[in-house]
UniProtKB/Swiss-Prot annotation:
Domain of life: Viruses
Protein name: Protein MGF 110-13L-B
Alphabetized UniProt keyword annotations: Early protein, Signal
Pfam families attached to this UniProt entry: v110
Signal peptide per UniProt: 1-16
Family note: Belongs to the asfivirus MGF 110 family.
Record's keyword annotation contains Signal: yes
InterPro entries noted in UniProt: ASFV_fam_110 (IPR004848)
Amino acid sequence: MKLLALLCILIWLSQPGLNRPLSIFYTKQNLPRTYTPPVRELEYWCTYGKHCDFCWECRNGICKNKVWDDMPLIKQNDYISQCSIARYFDRCMYFIKPKSPYIHYMDCSQPIVYKGFSH
């Protein structure tokens, strides 16, 4: 019975896009400002900053989402903004460079989606 419960939990944790907070293990670690989030955290950062360039792989003007396979392909355009991220003491930050730069602050354990894109 314990094995079945463990298996159910592992399946649930493997589901993409559940909008769950960043693991408490990672929130205890500072992450200096970077343009490339750690692979193990990519789902987290792309859930709350869907427009960030590190969430997309673009070739010949066509972009595919790196995290969710069911996302449609898009043309490379202003929807995708250059972003960098950082984490200090449970404060997660997105530094977004659309037409006018913006910084989005949130508690890592209580994240909120950045809705400031006007595209």
